[in-house]
């Protein structure tokens, strides 16, 4: 996918990985970058606008845990303004296994709902033009960090959902791939709660392992966007971008 002159919606585009990725996207010259985030950050929006004045940056407050109908309403506002959208990035995520329901709501249900909502505008069965979904999942969707089983399971669910959406592309016209960062130096991993307090030092122990910067992750994210490979399972770890070959242990046969 060519980012230049495209229209992109980025959910949680002002977070740790999100903000650096927004910067890299803006440098590539899209026509519009629409940022949806729970918390407004005027300074970050101003920085993005200054980075490339030719790009129109728009912000809308958005919490991915709202009902599906509210998400559809917001997307209608965006589509009415832009007419077309080329790429949806779902990047919302929390890491706190004390908040079981919210972890599932943000990391999984929110991704499902935003993707489902945009199908109203993209689905070729409804006369839509199709589109591309990039879902930020996690390497914990491959192999869990067992001290945070709720977080890990939510990311595995998001990965499975994304893979299924990709396989439906011939029906809907919507392609999809997953972005799976490894341990990245963000506020998210500096301090977080394990499930039932099974490992109070989990954040400290995790950061003893090799990590990557948000910039390294963002630069590889843009490479994945440009590759635009339907069904790809991208691992973004230690400053590298690698396509994962998923091992098939069972097939529904349908």
UniProtKB/Swiss-Prot annotation:
Q: Partners and quaternary state?
A: Homodimer.
What reaction is this protein's catalytic activity?
Answer: a primary alcohol + NAD(+) = an aldehyde + NADH + H(+); a secondary alcohol + NAD(+) = a ketone + NADH + H(+)
Q: State the family it belongs to.
A: Belongs to the short-chain dehydrogenases/reductases (SDR) family.
Q: What is the lineage of its organism?
A: Eukaryota, Metazoa, Ecdysozoa, Arthropoda, Hexapoda
Q: Where does the chain cross the membrane? A: none
Catalytic EC class: oxidoreductase
Q: Which residues bind NAD(+)?
A: 10-33
Q: What is this protein called?
A: Alcohol dehydrogenase
Q: Entry's CDD domains?
A: ADH_SDR_c_like
Q: Name one GO molecular function term.
A: alcohol dehydrogenase (NAD+) activity
State the SUPFAM superfamilies in the record.
Answer: NAD(P)-binding Rossmann-fold domains
A GO cellular component annotated for this chain's UniProt record is:
cytoplasm
Which Enzyme Commission numbers does its entry carry?
A: 1.1.1.1
Q: Which BP terms from GO are recorded? A: alcohol metabolic process
- Say if the entry is tagged with keyword Zinc: no
Which gene holds the coding sequence for this protein? Adh
Active site annotation, chain numbering: 151 (proton acceptor)
Q: Give the top-rank taxon of the lineage listed in the UniProt record for this protein.
A: Eukaryota
Task: Summarize where substrate binds, as residue positions.
Answer: 138
Q: Which UniProt keywords apply?
A: NAD, Oxidoreductase
């Amino acid at each position: 996918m060519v980012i230049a002159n495209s229209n992109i919606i980025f959910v949680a585009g002002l977070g740790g990985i999100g903000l650096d990725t927004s910067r890299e996207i803006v440098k590539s010259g899209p026509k519009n970058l629409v940022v949806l985030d729970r918390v407004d950050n005027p300074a970050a929006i101003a920085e993005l606008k200054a980075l490339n004045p030719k790009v129109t940056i728009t912000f809308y407050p958005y919490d991915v845990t709202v009902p599906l109908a509210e998400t559809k309403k917001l997307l209608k506002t965006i589509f009415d303004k832009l007419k077309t959208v080329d790429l949806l990035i779902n990047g919302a995520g929390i890491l706190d296994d004390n908040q079981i329901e919210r972890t599932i709501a943000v990391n999984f249900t929110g991704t499902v709902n935003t993707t489902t909502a945009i199908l109203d505008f993209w689905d070729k069965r409804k006369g839509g033009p199709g589109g591309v979904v990039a879902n930020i999942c996690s390497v914990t969707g491959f192999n869990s960090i067992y001290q945070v089983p709720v977080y890990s399971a939510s990311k595995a669910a998001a990965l499975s959902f994304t893979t299924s959406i990709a396989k439906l592309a011939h029906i809907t016209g919507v392609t999809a791939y997953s972005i799976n960062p490894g341990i990245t130096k963000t506020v998210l991993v500096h301090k977080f709660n394990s499930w039932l307090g099974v490992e109070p030092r989990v954040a400290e122990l995790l950061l003893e392992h090799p990590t990557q910067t948000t910039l390294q992750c963002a630069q590889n994210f843009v490479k994945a966007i440009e590759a635009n490979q339907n069904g790809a399972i991208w691992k973004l770890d230690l400053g590298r971008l690698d396509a994962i070959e998923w091992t098939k242990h069972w097939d529904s046969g349908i």
